[in-house]
From Swiss-Prot:
This is Exportin-6-B. Gene3D superfamilies: Leucine-rich Repeat Variant. It is found in: Nucleus; Cytoplasm. Residues 291-315 are annotated as: Disordered. It comes from the Eukaryota. Pfam families: IBN_N (PF03810), Xpo1 (PF08389). It comes from Xenopus laevis. Belongs to the exportin family. Residues 31-97 form the Importin N-terminal domain. The gene is xpo6-b. GO terms for cellular component: cytoplasm; nucleus.
């Protein structure tokens, strides 16, 4: 024993040293190595058992348990049978004798180690493993311990990790399922006995003034009088130990429900018991008070043990935790979409009982409003309850709605109260998501049963009307100022939205869904609110005071400023709402809802012109930090709302183009009048961009013939082509040039080709681009300036000009031939100049990237218009310039600019190799040479994915669109030959490309892996790649082997399904060869397995040829191979003493 005591003292000393703050990292590594070596010895467990029995040092205890854990999970096969029996006998005894004195985390770890033994040996060698757990639960003094063991067993055995064979996993699951009825019965008994013991009969309280309605509702929800009575009784007071037992039991149930199927084992009695505990969470008083003391002892838990009785009741925040755990159990049941027919009645019972709780939560009393009650509940409980409601609506409403025993309309009434009394913004938005799910359900139901539309809408109309009114009120400061001012409108989240924008977007989505169901009512409600706030805004012109050239808004009183601020914020929100509803006025309902849409559009045009004329956005105000942003936002939102109606305006134009277009012309002309004052570098960018976007939409979507003749649009033309005018911000400049170019390039709708006036428009467009490229064309024949300042100025001219031109090209790339011809005629000189300047700026990454982006747009949109000679000249120039040295310089330089240059170049080549004609075919050898000889060696071993994605896409497109470069035979010939023995050309290049794809599967980057795997699959489906003789004989075994190794090493686990399908497609080329030759050869080459294990793996791989069975066999092979390797890990020789 001396050696054990000495070792214990040494271990305690080492542990203290390891965790001491002055111990160096080097010394820690030495200690760690020593401890690891000690743990690897087969006899180490004896010392560790002594440490567990004798030590009180938590570090020592955890280390000792980790040694057992390692022994059981990684070395168990090598442990002699006699020692296994000793361990299986000793550890449970140790747990039983010391569980009350051990810290909880040590006790939990010891339970886990014992369960790990059960995972390995139950039932063959550890036949009483589960029986012992059940006995622990049934013995009052060890009930908590038994429940911890049960939960751990559920976690570790039902869904075990990959350190077990598939057969063992299936066996464990089957064994556990056999125990489920017994376990659920036991848990029901534990919970019921504690509940019944602590329940007290309370005197019936007098009815509250608000009780009658809710009692009627309760009787509607629950049709079982006894159950209603039970649920209405006051909850019992539980002492701390009973709380703990109940919490453990509910945790067990929650985990069991996560994996067991719905069945009769989940009895009505169990469900009722769970709901008893769920009630504890909706006791509004539980956040701030504790239960009265009780004289009951803990004998129900402790049995005849000598533990002293616990007289103090547990704090009710712990009772609230029981409510949270009970709701977790209910939600685990609710999230199961597959509900057996025999469980439908149980499902109804679950819903009825939960909505009893909802009724309790939303009941108003003299002492508590609904909001106060929700504020006093545990936040976690409210979250769980909201989760339940979401699951009910999204998964089960379709099952329950038609059941006469479930009053859906009354449920919606409760949900309404629950939603609009949420104490937090997050809680409210979560509830809005539930309403959105309900509205989607209703919309889909109506689409599938159009003949019942009126009946369905009629049933829910009152609820929808109330919902719309309240949601609109909630986004208005007039009704909800206190809460709305809490929302952050500055910090952006991951979706680039502020908290306020997210709140508004959620709300408007609900409004839009109601609009689809109740269009007339929704529109009238919204438009009335909009009109009310517009009157305030339009009336501001009466409050203007002029002082010389300056104007001031004469609203100075603090209360008036506050009211104006609220009204402007509300107007901004309502304008966004009106814009969001634009889609509900087009399509089949255009005619029916025309008058409503016309009212909106005319009002929006009036507002935008008003804002631009009196320039409220430039006014001096009493509170400039508040009111000025409000005025700017209203003006910007009015422009954005009008832009949202551009598709409606396009439809309106097509209806009146040939007859009585005067009203339409007036609308467009008036709207355009609002723009020129805003097209200025002095105007706030938010407002400027809104004006630009509106012009783009009118020019691109509506395309009126008369747009170019409107004086306001001609003013914008003059502003943008005036070389002396101050340049606008970059984004605004690009948008305006796009709009003006589209005015001239896009064909007018419903106008014959002969009346499109292309000649005149072409001349105007040439003048426009000449003006925009004036400074750029002055660079012709020049070389880059030597002085840094001049060079930067020149680069700025190049980048700004090419950015505008690229945008112009991209926006007409999908248009007809005439538009593209006209565009290229205007661009021809700039294109030639760009190619001439390219070599001079090859070392300026930012300029080169912009030039390549421009040429990429030309190739994608105007390839035909450029003509073969010029395109060939461009390609040849690029191929000459991008030497291996230049590519290396670009890729290896600091930052990502150089990589972007190469990626843009590869994108251009992608367009080239996809060209169907023969014009660019002569470039294929040069492109392949550049890719595989110059570029690939530079990036192959770089861990960074930069450039790789574009390179492999280029190689894929080259193969896909130029298959006959490698396989020249006709389609008919390849069919007759079955594709496997076609004559091949350029074989060496093909092999090099395939090797590059294969090499990419050995790289860690998952995106490249997924991309390239999909490319191979596409080449197989389109060109039978896997069937080609060269691939089949030389490459296919290597690819399958690599993919299987990837699965075995778990390096790309997210792609398990895709890899399995790819292996199947490769194997299906010749299943016989795969089963008889490849699989045995693959297993023979696998390291770390003995011969018998390889035979078992081969035997277990079922020779079935359908995809599901085959991929299941693949994943079984991978799992079991990993398991065998784990079992075979050899132990290091020698003994290490502490």
């Amino acid at each position: 024993m001396a050696s054990e005591e000495t070792s214990l003292r040494a271990l305690e000393s080492l542990m203290s040293e390891f965790f001491h703050n002055v111990t160096s990292n080097e010394r820690k590594r030495e200690i760690e190595s020593l401890l690891n070596n000690f743990a690897q010895q087969l006899g180490a467990w004896r010392f560790c058992f002594y440490f567990l029995s004798e030590s009180h040092n938590d570090y020592v205890l955890m280390y000792s348990l980790s040694v057992f854990e390692n022994l059981i999970n990684k070395m168990w096969l090598g442990v002699p049978s006699q020692e296994k029996m000793q361990i299986r006998s000793s550890l449970p005894k140790l747990l039983l004798s010391q569980h009350k004195s051990l810290p909880s985390f040590i006790c939990n770890k010891l339970c886990k180690v014992i369960v790990d033994m059960g995972r390995q040996d139950w039932p063959m060698f550890y036949h009483d493993f589960f029986t012992n757990i059940l006995q622990l639960i049934q013995t009052p003094s060890t009930t908590p311990l038994g429940l911890i063991m049960l939960k751990t067993a559920s976690e570790e055995l039902a869904c075990p990790r990959e350190d077990l064979s598939v057969a063992r996993k299936e066996e464990l699951r089957k064994l556990l399922l056999e125990q489920v009825p017994t376990v659920l019965g036991l848990l029901t008994g534990v919970l019921e006995s504690i509940w019944d013991k602590h329940s007290i009969t309370a005197a019936t309280p007098p009815p509250s003034p608000t009780a009658s309605d809710t009692d009627d509702l309760l009787s509607n929800l629950i049709h079982t009088p006894n159950l209603t009575k039970q649920l209405s009784q006051p909850p019992p007071s539980l002492e701390a130990e009973s709380e703990r037992v109940c919490a453990l039991a509910l945790e067990c149930l929650s985990h069991l429900f996560s994996w067991i199927p719905l069945s009769a084992s989940i009895t009505p009695s169990l469900l009722t018991t769970i709901f008893h505990f769920a009630r504890l969470g909706c006791d509004a008083r539980s956040r701030h008070t504790t239960s009265v003391t009780t004289n009951t002892t803990s004998s129900v838990v402790n049995g005849g043990s000598s533990s002293p009785p616990l007289h103090s009741a547990a704090p009710t925040r712990d009772r609230g935790r029981l409510g949270v755990l009970a709701m977790s159990c209910i939600n685990e049941l609710m999230c199961k979409n597959c509900v057996p027919l025999e469980f439908q009645e149980y499902l109804l019972r679950v819903c009825q009982q939960t909505f009893y709780l909802l009724q309790r939560i939303t009941r108003e009393t003299n002492a508590h409003s609904v909001r106060n009650r929700l504020e006093e509940l545990d936040e976690s409980y409210v979250e769980k309850f909201t989760d339940f409601l979401r699951l009910f609506v999204s998964v089960h409403l379709r099952r329950i709605e038609s059941n006469a025993q479930f009053p859906v309309v009354e449920f919606l009434s409760l949900l309404f109260k629950y939603t609009f009394h949420q104490p937090s913004h997050e809680g409210y938005l979560s509830c809005l998501d539930i309403w959105a799910l309900f509205l989607d359900y209703l919309t889909n139901k109506i689409r599938n049963r159009l003949e019942d539309r009126e009946a369905i809408i009629g049933r829910y109309e009152d609820a929808l009307v109330l919902l719309l009114t309240e949601v609109l009120n909630r986004i208005q400061f007039r009704f909800n100022q206190t809460q709305l001012e809490e929302l952050d409108d500055e910090t952006l989240d991951d979706d680039q939205q502020t908290e306020w924008q997210r709140y508004l977007r959620h709300s408007l989505e609900v409004v839009a869904k109601i609009m689809e169901l109740l269009p007339t009512h929704a529109f009238s409600t919204l438009f009335a609110a909009l009109q009310e706030n517009l009157e305030v805004y339009l009336g501001l012109q009466r409050c203007l005071v002029t002082n010389g050239n300056d104007q001031r808004l004469n609203v100075t009183a603090e209360n008036d400023c506050r009211r104006l601020h609220c009204s402007l914020r509300d107007l901004s929100s309502l304008l966004q709402a009106v814009g969001r509803l634009a889609e509900y006025f087009i399509g089949d309902v255009f005619g029916a809802r025309f008058n409503d849409a016309l009212r909106v559009v005319e009002r929006l045009v009036e507002v935008t012109l008003y804002g631009s004329r009196i320039k409220l956005y430039n006014m001096e105000t009493a509170v400039p930090s508040v009111l000025k942003p409000d005025l700017i936002d209203v003006h910007a939102q009015s422009l954005a709302a009008l832009q949202a109606y551009s598709h409606w305006l396009a439809r309106y134009y097509s209806e009146v183009q040939r007859q009585n277009p005067e009203q339409f012309i007036s609308i467009i002309s008036t709207a355009m009048e609002a723009l020129p004052p805003l097209i200025s570098s002095k105007v706030q960018e938010k407002l400027l961009l809104s004006a630009c976007h509106l012009l783009v939409s009118i020019a691109t979507t509506v395309r009126p013939v008369f747009l170019i003749n409107i004086p306001a649009v001609q003013k914008v033309f003059s502003r943008i082509t005036d070389g002396s005018a101050q340049r606008l911000p970059e984004e605004a400049q690009v948008l305006l040039c796009r709009a003006l170019s589209n005015v001239l390039l896009l064909p007018w709708p419903n106008v014959p080709e002969g009346e499109q006036q292309w000649g005149e428009r072409s001349s105007h467009h040439a003048n426009l681009l000449n003006a925009l490229t004036r400074d750029y064309r002055l660079l012709k024949g020049s070389s880059p300036p030597q002085r840094k300042g001049q060079l930067e100025a020149t680069k700025r001219v190049i980048c700004q000009t090419l950015g505008v031109l690229r945008d112009v090209v991209e926006n007409i790339s999908g248009e007809g031939t005439k538009s593209r011809q006209t565009c290229y005629q205007s661009l021809h000189e700039s294109s030639q100049l760009s190619l001439a300047l390219f070599p001079a700026y090859i070392h300026q990454s930012d300029v080169t990237e912009e030039m390549l982006s421009f040429f990429l747009a030309l190739f994608q949109g105007l390839r035909v218009q450029m003509g073969a000679p010029f395109t060939e000249q461009i390609i040849q120039t690029f191929l000459n310039m991008f030497t291996r040295e230049q590519l290396a310089e670009s890729i290896l330089q600091e930052g990502s600019a150089g990589c972007h240059v190469v990626e843009k170049f590869l994108k251009i080549l992608q367009v080239v190799v996809q060209e169907p004609g023969q014009a660019f075919k002569p470039f294929l050898p040069s492109i392949l040479s550049l890719c595989m000889e110059q570029l690939y060696p530079i990036i192959a071993e770089r861990p960074s994915p930069d450039v790789k994605a574009e390179l492999f896409e280029l190689l894929f497109q080259l193969l896909h669109h130029n298959w006959r470069y490698f396989y020249r035979s006709s389609v008919l010939a390849s069919v007759h030959r079955d594709g496997s023995d076609e004559p091949m050309e350029n074989q060496a290049q093909f092999i090099v490309v395939m090797q590059a794809f294969g090499q990419s599967f050995l790289q860690p980057d998952i995106h490249i892996f997924r991309q390239n795997l999909s490319y191979l699959e596409t080449l197989n489906s389109k060109h039978k790649l896997y069937h080609k003789k060269l691939f089949q004989t030389v490459m296919l075994p290597q690819f399958v082997s690599v993919l299987l190794q990837v699965l075995i090493h778990k390096s790309h686990d997210l792609l398990q399904e895709e890899i399995g399908i790819a292996v199947y497609n490769m194997a299906s080329v010749d299943f016989s060869t795969f089963f008889s030759a490849f699989l045995p050869e693959f297993l023979t080459g696998c390291q770390g397995l003995d011969t018998s294990q390889k035979s078992v793996l081969a035997r277990n791989f079922k020779m079935e040829r359908d995809l599901p069975s085959f991929t299941q066999s693949v994943h079984r092979l991978v799992n079991d191979l990993r398991y065998y390797r784990l079992c075979n890990d050899s132990l290091p020789p020698g003994t290490v003493k502490l």
